[in-house]
Amino acid sequence: MHHVLNSTRPDHRFWFYDDVTQYGRTKYLNYYTPLVLLIFTVLFITYNIWKHYYYYDVLHLKQKNPIDELLYSSTDEDEQSPLINNNTITTNYVDNNCTKDALKNRHFSLEKLKSVKVNGEPHGTPEIVRRGFIEKSRIILEFFLVLSQVIIHSFILLHYVNKNPEFTQQGTITGLVEWCALFIIVSLRLANVNQNFKFINKYPGNLWSVSFINYLALFISMILPFRSIFIHHINSPISRKYYISQISINLALFLLLFFARIRNNFAIIYKTDSWITPSPEPVTSIAGFICWAWLDSFVWKAHKVSIKVKDIWGLMMQDYSFFVVKKFRYFVDHKVKRKRIFSLNLFFFFSNYLVLQCFWAFLGSVLSFIPTVLLKRILEYVEDQSSAPSNLAWFYVTVMFVGRILVAICQAQALFFGRRVCIRMKSIIISEIYTKALRRKISTNKTKPSNEDPQEINDQKSINGDEESTSSANLGAIINLMAIDAFKVSEICGYLHSFLEAFVMTVVALALLYRLLGFAAIVGVLIIVAMLPLNYKLAKYIGDLQKKNLAVTDNRIQKLNEAFQAIRIIKYFSWEENFEKDINTIRENELSLLLMRSIVWSISSFLWFVTPTIVTAASFAYYIYVQGEVLTTPVAFTALSLFTLLRDPLDRLSDMLSFVVQSKVSLDRVQDFLNENDTKKYDQLTIDPNGNRFAFENSTISWDKDNQDFKLKDLNIEFKTGKLNVVIGPTGSGKTSLLMALLGEMYLLNGKVVVPALEPRQELIVDANGTTNSIAYCSQAAWLLNDTVKNNILFNSPFNEARYKAVVEACGLKRDFEILKAGDLTEIGEKGITLSGGQKQRVSLARALYSNARHVLLDDCLSAVDSHTASWIYDNCITGPLMEDRTCILVSHNIALTLRNAELVVLLEDGRVKDQGDPIDMLQKGLFGEDELVKSSILSRANSSANLAAKSSTSLSNLPAVKEQQVSVNNNSSHFEAKKLQKSLRTEAERTEDGKLIKEETKEEGVVGLDVYKWYLKIFGGWKIVSFLASLFLIAQLLYIGQSWWVRAWASHNVIAKIIPRAQRAIAFISKKASHLIDWRGSSQISMASAENQPSSGHSTMYYLVLYLIIGFAQALLGAGKTILNFVAGINASRKIFNMILNKVLHSKIRFFDATPTGRIMNRFSKDIEAIDQELTPYIQGAFYSLIECLSTVILITFITPQFLSVAIVVSILYYFVGYFYMAGSRELKRFESISRSPIYQHFSETLVGVTTIRAFGDEGRFMQENLHKIDENNKPFFYLWVANRWLAFRIDMIGSLVIFGAGLFILFNINNLDSGMAGISLTYAISFTEGALWLVRLYSEVEMNMNSVERVKEYMEIEQEPYNEHKEIPPPQWPQDGKIEVNDLSLRYAPNLPRVIKNVSFSVDAQSKIGIVGRTGAGKSTIITALFRFLEPETGHIKIDNIDISGVDLQRLRRSITIIPQDPTLFSGTIKTNLDPYDEFSDRQIFEALKRVNLISEEQLQQGATRETSNEASSTNSENVNKFLDLSSEISEGGSNLSQGQRQLMCLARSLLRSPKIILLDEATASIDYSSDAKIQETIRKEFQGSTILTIAHRLRSVIDYDKILVMDAGEVKEYDHPYSLLLNKQSAFYSMCEHSGELDILIELAKKAFVEKLNSKKD
């Protein structure tokens, strides 16, 4: 043997017996290896020099900087131009040659976003990391090591070539040339160590990579010669010294570069904030990448202290959403030649990463068979030690160990590339959804059947521009697209390589099986192929169920969102139980689909469990009965190991098919959403060349091209530029629609709509007057951000203190800021929840006024404020200095106030212009009715104009302050002055803290508490069900082990008899051909193609075969059974959890909803519930199964080789520490990832509700940037969570490799005491142990991370509840009979730490009397009303109704006994009937009567029988607008978004009329209704509620002037309480002052006197 290995004869074998031959060393390792590397090096450098010379020297192309490519758009050369150019003043900002698409693109293009944050600061700063002393020392040391190699090879060439057979001339010369080339390369790198030589930087390419590849290949080529020295097959001293020096120097060179932090060029890190540590990836060595050591410092810190948000590192520059989406949009817009669907664009965009992922997956799949291939060799050695030398057996064990490590590296890299694609794809999908939601139409209003796509089901959009309801109709579906669909689509990318892995592993396994079993393996393949269609059908069915489930989930989330958005009205009417029942009905449908999916999944699991058993049994049967072979231990266990390896990819393929189908469903939903129609705003609006016109030219406009129930018809209006234009008309006449048409939100059927400009806000140029040619818009229902008051007013405009103060004063907000504890730094909550309706409206108005827009559109902004505030706003804001030379188009019902300074009045009626022109001309035509106040107001226009001119002459800086007595009661001025002084002395930080309303989302620290597990397990079914399931798992695992043991028994009963001659001839032929290069002693008779065949003794083969099948089927049945039982228990637990937290949230105190954004609540009910529904149970099952698998493996190996116990202890300790360190960081990252999702949902919710305002301001870019920022805040913990996962997986694999090595080691130590069957069981389980251990830690971490969802949901079990079903006394059945109210010494706070908002208020209300409550906005009027519903519990005092203290009355009874018509009218998706009579308590005739009484339908229509059938016929014609209230089945969108604000208020009034309550409360119920309709409704209220007690909050003093008493509130105190006429007799009274400031004093005195006289006369009667 030694002679053959070192013979000089021309034997061309590379390997002989147990070692590489001398020919193999000299020819393949010393000659071919350096030759190939030399050719590669020369070609690489030559190609790079040619490429750079040709492109940059010949073609003169600009060399691109990768940083600049990311920072700046390559398509926008003006990207970095100044935002404001003070040297350029122009009125025409629109390039008339610019296409409509280009204009739209400038608004919504993600590619054109600037690399700045929302606040205008740079997005981040790239910083170059230069080489330090250590890195430079590395290159110097490398230089000398390469030089030493040149010297060594020169010495060998001169002294030993042809003298020693190890050193051939061609090999030595080639090696010398190779090292000379490497010496030149390292010299160039050393010379350019500071990157000073442009030639080296520009031409040769990445020389560092060339060096590294060469060193690595040369080091690997020396491993086998070094082994030859180790086993004494090379004995020549010089040869031994040569190979030892080569492996030493090559290893040193390899390690120098392997651990180098900075490679070819300087590393670049990207810093976004000073307190955020940038990602260390750019300065991480290859070693750090492979073993994930770059995360060590983070893991160590997380172990020592609980990490905070600031401790989470930043992302790599290329991973930030801004750069990702920018590159994606550039790719789609410029590199995609034809329009492709979204999914294909994603695929091609990430193709490079996916190819790399597949490369690593392919490599890992092939290497994963090394242990199995070597398993047979080891078992053959155990069975017959003469078959190979012992050093070869040790070599096999070592290779198994190394092979497992290489597989771990490959799998980790494949998963990491996939995860990187995942976070980038998630950024793209969410940003595309968000951008689409900003730019799509809002006018569609369709109802789809329930089996349609869920996005379409919820596609209910606003048709009137009301910001409160613009997008809430489909908000649930959009949240679902983000929270679930975007995640599912992006998540699949992390595992796409599994398809390739499954394919490669299947092919390799089948090839090896064929070599092992021959045609018997084909039988197994055919069975697998036969099972594929069935599994495909099951996977498809699971996908169909998932699609249906997502549709129902959309419906549930929509219903939840609707309930949480309207929680106040639900509590007012005590509808919690009804909504809970409706939501739970949907929930049951969802859970039934989940259960069905689980059953199908279990059937699929059974098939995947049983398939390997059937395949193995069939193959063995064919092998024995047809081929006539006898099963031996090596063959049996090698086959079992291969079938196990085959099962893994098939299992993975099963799961992946299911996941891919689910992801395809999600991707289709996203695609459908992205395919929805965009807004036609930029296509249909005509931009005025002079930049100053608002006009309609023969325009006919509807909300939808196909649905034209309401139209603006034949409009011809030319609005006055730089002047006040007022649009008036009755409720539902189309006033808001007209503004929406100007904003481009409606559908232009014909004609033209001319606007002055449509430029994006970031491109606006400020003119000499400080204005921009843009539009500001204030909606009818105020839209506010969940931020401070100040930030809402600024709306990201630069802060100008003088202008800001002037705006605050002009909008009457100065005193409100003095009342608020934190002033303008007060957080106003979601939708401005902490402010009154009037305050919200004025903040919204202040935003429009503060903007530098030259054109302002105001939609009924005076309706929510009291009369004197309305007068102040009109004089100082709408017609004040700040509005000078600005075009203002105002929609208003308050014609007496608003017409006097109007240049143009447009009167609308039923969608047509009834008349337009100068208000005096229209007055003379009698178009304004007989109201004397209107007449006097218009006729005094000349005087008002003079006053306006006087005000206009006052400069902004000298804008007069608001007189304290003008906006408050005189005797309170000193109080507020003192408060103002006190406030000014406090720091802004203190004010900010005082102003905080929204609580930070809570985050537990450390391990998920044991109480959380106990709580969940109790709901899961308690210890009984857990114990039962655990026993099923144990029995299933015992059966699995029993199968292997049975195979051992089967094979052990065979004895050697004879070898079939035909098999011998085949083996000899194959061996002869295979031994051309490699010769194995003994393997010419025993190869992978066959094994020694032994006839059986004892039981027959059929006996073993049948029992093997029985065990396999039993194990599969148990596996499927435990799966379905686990799913059933999990679904039942999920049902209970959902029901409990829904009940808790719906019955929580209203303060919870004020302090908790809806997006945060929706996060609990969407993503967290989805995790509990679909992820937690499978993860628990998987983790428990992996635990049993690992424990059984360790016990089994220890039983077979007791010495393994020492390894098991060490392995267990290592696993504990690795798991401990991992869990410390990962659980916190998971919590931060969960918390950081809520702001994304909240931001979606806010911005989509205000989409009309955002588009009006042209501020889409800023909101898109903010969305990207919030995505990044979520991506950071998400990304590092999965990097931590890779950190864990690598270490688990390393430790698992020790198990394989230990098992092999102790088998060889105990070789004389073991049979091959026991050794086969030990090694087979050791090979699979690593995978099981990895999944154990990974799945346990997933369990804990998903238990975080349980933990977060459990928090809502501790929400403070309203005292339902708690009562000290039970009122009589007819209570309240009289309606008498007594309020005594009442004080209220919104929260214990907040100041009192109601202060010692006392008053009484007689039965059946009517009380008007008036006062400034924010005076506490609405708070008094809510106190009657016990939204706030009294700090002092009490409220009694009919002499019963309401604090002792059951809440449900109380709230159903009184009725409120709230300030913000709330309707629900459904029909007119379901909104008025949700629980079918009234007849259609009663409902029509209620509609008639609130003037939504006329008596004439009702008498003509305009019922459902006739109205349906009428609605088929589009010639005239149809009254939809004639058909009770007419659809109402969520929030009533397809009705005007006034119509919604009337609907709410009609709903209350139906209930005929004894006490009715009206909170600005007619604020958005025209005065004429208001008068009729007030008459209806007086008539219909004669026997009821009425409390009305009103800003229109005329509405309550004839009431029995007026309650004047100010700053939470009662200032006056008497008959209105009595109050007016006192000219010093606050009420008199209010009437005086309203401009209606004389009329109000007359009406009050008339009511007073009538009351006196009625008493006499």
Swiss-Prot record:
GO biological process terms held by the UniProt record: calcium ion transport; monocarboxylic acid transport; transmembrane transport
Coiled-coil segments: none
GO molecular function annotations of the record: ABC-type transporter activity; ATP binding; ATP hydrolysis activity; ATPase-coupled monocarboxylic acid transmembrane transporter activity; ATPase-coupled transmembrane transporter activity
Sites where the protein binds ATP 2: 1415-1422
Glycosylation sites: 6, 97
Positions annotated to bind ATP 1: 729-736
Main localization of the protein described in the UniProt heading: membrane
Occurrences of domain ABC transmembrane type-1 (ranges): 354-662, 1026-1345
Domain ABC transporter: 694-935, 1381-1636
Protein keywords: ATP-binding, Calcium, Calcium transport, Glycoprotein, Ion transport, Membrane, Nucleotide-binding, Phosphoprotein, Repeat, Transmembrane, Transmembrane helix, Transport, Vacuole
Topology, Lumenal side: 1-33, 96-133, 188-205, 367-393, 517-519, 624-644, 1075-1114, 1200, 1314-1315
Topology feature Cytoplasmic, residues: 55-74, 155-166, 227-345, 415-495, 541-602, 666-1053, 1136-1178, 1222-1292, 1337-1661
Transmembrane segments: 34-54, 75-95, 134-154, 167-187, 206-226, 346-366, 394-414, 496-516, 520-540, 603-623, 645-665, 1054-1074, 1115-1135, 1179-1199, 1201-1221, 1293-1313, 1316-1336
Chain positions found as Phosphoserine: 936, 940, 955
Gene3D superfamilies, per database record: ABC transporter type 1, transmembrane domain, P-loop containing nucleotide triphosphate hydrolases
Membrane-topology descriptor: Multi-pass membrane protein
GO CC aspect terms: endoplasmic reticulum; fungal-type vacuole; fungal-type vacuole membrane; membrane raft
Subcellular location: Vacuole membrane
Pfam families, A to Z: ABC_membrane, ABC_tran
Region feature Disordered, mapped onto this chain: 445-468
Functional note: Vacuolar class C ABC transporter which regulates the translocation of phosphatidylcholine to the vacuole lumen, the release of lumenal calcium stores, and acts as a negative regulator of vacuole fusion. Exhibits ATP-dependent bile acid transport.
Miscellaneous comment: Present with 3000 molecules/cell in log phase SD medium.
Family: Belongs to the ABC transporter superfamily. ABCC family. Conjugate transporter (TC 3.A.1.208) subfamily.
Listed PANTHER family: ABC TRANSPORTER ATP-BINDING PROTEIN_PERMEASE VMR1-RELATED, ATP-BINDING CASSETTE SUB-FAMILY C
Stated name of the protein: ATP-dependent bile acid permease
Native species: Saccharomyces cerevisiae (strain ATCC 204508 / S288c) (Baker's yeast)
Upper taxonomic lineage: Eukaryota, Fungi, Dikarya, Ascomycota, Saccharomycotina
